[in-house]
A protein has these predicted regions:
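P-loop NTPase motor domains
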Residues: 1-170, 183-186, 224, 233-238, ...
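Conserved beta-strand segments of the P-loop GTPase G domain that flank and frequently precede/overlap
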Residues: 104, 175-176, 201-202
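Conserved H-loop
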Residues: 170, 175-178
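Short acidic loop-to-helix transition motifs that present clustered carboxylates
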Residues: 179-182, 206
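A short helix-turn-beta junction within AAA+ P-loop NTPase domains corresponding to the substrate/partner-engaging
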Residues: 189-200
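Conserved AAA+ ATPase core "coupling" helix
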Residues: 207-211
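Conserved small helical "lid"/interfacial subdomain of P-loop NTPases
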Residues: 214-215
Length: 244
């Protein structure tokens, strides 16, 4: 159900914010789930007003719970609700039903970037699912892909995109100008295994050697990405399989 999916999303969000090395404990997960159900139950009673729950609503519901674990979770979320990183604790002013939606994470600090990526990933998953039900394909473009793969949680998500979401009509494309960092990711092999279309522009010598070893490019093929005009950029483009 939509409520279960949202509960799962918020559990993983709290895991990112609160969990630490050991992750959320069973009691903490139970408390979060209870609060999510309560928040969405209250929202259901006011559907005509168009009210959408915010992270603030979960924060306040946690403060009303008797368990000390709830207090711990609420304290961790405070930074993102009433603290200096409360950017996402507001109703969106973006038309998310537009045919083209662009998320720009440039300039965000590391802590806020992780939260932003998690929220963006949830939106992509929901959009792909909704479009698939309506028989519509979803084209997703991920720029500066080597940066997105630095976070293990986000990297794992992109493996899911390349393996699973494409079966729901998602056509993901990744772009990067840093081949070394891209191929250093632990998850890149899984992504490359599910990619059958690549565009390679001119590459530095060290990058050409890495590409030749990693994806089996011949010397003759490498000759096409050896020379470039003055001012030209090095660019790599990956696209997942478009068919199951």
């Amino acid at each position: 159900s939509p409520r279960s999916l949202k509960a799962d999303f918020l559990l993983s969000l709290c895991e990112l914010v609160v969990g630490g090395r050991d992750g959320l404990q069973p009691i903490e997960k139970t408390v979060i789930d209870r609060c999510v159900r309560q928040v969405y139950r209250e929202m259901a009673l006011g559907l005509e007003t168009g009210k959408t729950p915010l992270l603030q609503d979960l924060y306040e519901e946690l403060l009303r719970q008797p368990e000390p674990e709830a207090k711990r979770i609420a304290t961790a979320l405070e930074l993102y609700c009433t603290g200096s990183l409360n950017l996402f604790n507001h109703p969106t002013n973006v038309n998310l039903n537009s045919r083209v939606v662009c998320f720009v994470l440039k300039g965000m600090g590391e802590n806020l970037r992780k939260i932003a990526m998690h929220i963006t990933n949830d939106f992509v998953t929901s959009a792909v699912g909704n479009n698939f039900k309506n028989g519509v394909a979803t084209w997703c473009y991920f720029d500066e892909f080597h940066i997105l793969l630095r976070d293990p949680l986000t990297a794992s998500y992109f493996v899911t995109v390349w393996k699973m979401l494409r079966k729901q009509g998602c056509v993901p494309s990744a772009l990067t100008q840093n081949v070394k960092d891209l191929l250093a990711s632990r998850e890149i092999e899984n992504i490359l295994d599910n990619t059958d279309f690549m565009i390679l522009l001119s590459q530095a010598q060290s990058d050409r050697a890495i590409l030749a070893k990693q994806i089996g490019i011949s010397e003759h093929q490498l000759s096409y990405i050896t020379q470039s005009n003055s001012g030209a950029v090095s660019y790599t483009h990956l696209r997942a399989h478009e068919t199951c």
